[in-house]
């Protein structure tokens, strides 16, 4: 039995990691926010999945969650390994998504603070002299039936209301990765000897457009898709490179979001029929 400490363990990604670790019989601690005992305790293997992205309404909260606590842990914490959960959003409007690619910050990005804090935290990890691994998940999705997340929510709307409102361009495309794939990869990389000091993308490896998602919803629910013409931010994402994670985890086979939407629709219909 290994000791794991999961910061952000009550959040979307963190709770999935905690569930998998507990299911395998590991000793897992999820500290409460502002618990100073984390600096006096042997944390074992740390997975840092805490974070915040509301740059408009809570800029200092974004900094605190993404940087401040992590910096204190790197400087004062007692741990063997640390996995820091960053984001492939740092590749937005770039030509490459290689982990070694040069990165830029876009002045017209209203959430650039998020990218900046992620990059600062990554650099602190690399400069800390500690045993760290940095992972960059793409757009993480879940399929929990009653989740407020984007995909389950629009699936419920398609079935319950026969209508889905889309406030993005039809050709808006990004990489979607299942939360189960992210959690499993984080746990594997946390003990992988060759992942120390590495930055590793966790993604499907291909982009999916909003229209592809809408087409699946329409095909299996016959719902109406309403596209709203709004001024959408300049967000273009290159295809995410996954060669590094495959080299480290040869059996890494990420789920397909379109297939998972189809499964979610079937599950939701079965749930309604049973109730």
Where are the regions a protein language model picked out?
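NAD(P)-dependent short-chain dehydrogenase/reductase
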Residues: 123-173, 179-181, 217
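N-terminal Rossmann NAD(P)H-binding glycine-rich loop of SDR-like oxidoreductase domains
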Residues: 2-23
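Active-site segment of SDR-like NAD(P)-dependent oxidoreductases
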Residues: 53, 88-95, 138-141
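Conserved Rossmann-fold NAD(P)-dependent oxidoreductase catalytic core, especially the SDR/UDP-sugar
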Residues: 71-113
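SDR active-site strand-loop-helix element
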Residues: 7, 49, 82-88, 135-137
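NAD(P)H-binding glycine-rich loop region in Rossmannoid oxidoreductase-like domains
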Residues: 35-76, 90
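C-terminal substrate-binding subdomain of Rossmann-fold SDR/epimerase-dehydratase oxidoreductases
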Residues: 167-169, 174-275
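Short-chain dehydrogenase/reductase
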Residues: 63-64, 100-122, 148-152, 175-176, ...
